[in-house]
């Protein structure tokens, strides 16, 4: 099936429904590519050669090295799984363009239904996060050969090995399929989901985490190997065989076999005149090896998740407050990942479906957007109480904004909604009469309302006392120097949210009082 359509940049192209890697004979050899597993016998020198080759456009070894690292290092796999799993767990929706027409709104709703029914979408989102380690992830779109219900739909999306790709020397940010030529084969429009995840600034071949993680991976494996050798001899007595002068080679071999086997068999024979002695067991400590392994794993955690306290706690420096700080950092990384991924899915999934199926399509700049819901819902009680007070003093607050803040959808016209419950009929009658009584009621003085909002000295004292209590206890326990040493940890554990709320209220009230007095 062929038809002429516009790409997302507004350029016309001929749409091909067949998958590129299966329809073009020059790309068929890619199907028979198998990994050389470059992590086997990996040294710093070999790693440097692999990274240098990637910089020059040959991404094969670097992509295969990333696969090996993920398979061989359980810590790297664990940390990547946390970051990738955090992305796949977030809800999403299709948003229409700004100031959408009724037709654009209907098309956005149709795309939402199409993608909600797509059984391949969850795997597509997960496979796209493979770019976190390797810098990029490419998945090939398989279109339905005919129309389904009058629509051109995606049948499946297939992950493709990163080793299938290259970057040409003259376009180092352009991903191409390896076809045996120096420039490679361009990827066809509407045929790929191409996601790029930048761990740092640079050309496409240098932005993946693999280039940072390879070094702690190497040094950790050196330490693991040395640690295994240490465990083989640690605690075992030295078995020393002595043979007399003039012993033949055969007698020496007999003694050697006895020495080597007696530790396992607890018995053996040697010729008369030869001796077998047991020296003191080998001493040593595993702390050096474990320190190196711990350093490598913490370095990997910092690179992947931005910290270590969400991965492991040592019981000494780890506190709940510091753990929350590190978790906040991880959430920031997750939200950044989601923002980049949403742009990719809008460009490579939503736009093709929109351009091929929707009547409202006429401009590549006005398209529905794939968006992840990363908004944190507000505390319902605190938010409702604050809104009531703000409305009472004249704030004009849009309903849509309040619904978005609380993540409560607005009911459609025919949907049932919750109704306010009343304790007694009198309260119900009063609620019905509120609208009629409003014109007769006396409006309260704005300054009286503001005075009720302003925190009192007792409010401040009730909040500050718990904050200072650990510091006072530290001073009483160990004096000034002890308290000074503990201050950093104590500060991280302080929960100053209530104090911030009081100060915010005080500043807000002061500002409004100033404005009210200025008008008088």
From Swiss-Prot:
Q: What is this protein called?
A: Mu-like prophage FluMu protein gp29
What is the protein's species of origin? Answer: Haemophilus influenzae (strain ATCC 51907 / DSM 11121 / KW20 / Rd)
Q: Specify one Pfam family.
A: Portal_Mu
Which family is it part of?
To phage Mu protein gp29.
Cited InterPro entries: Portal_Mu
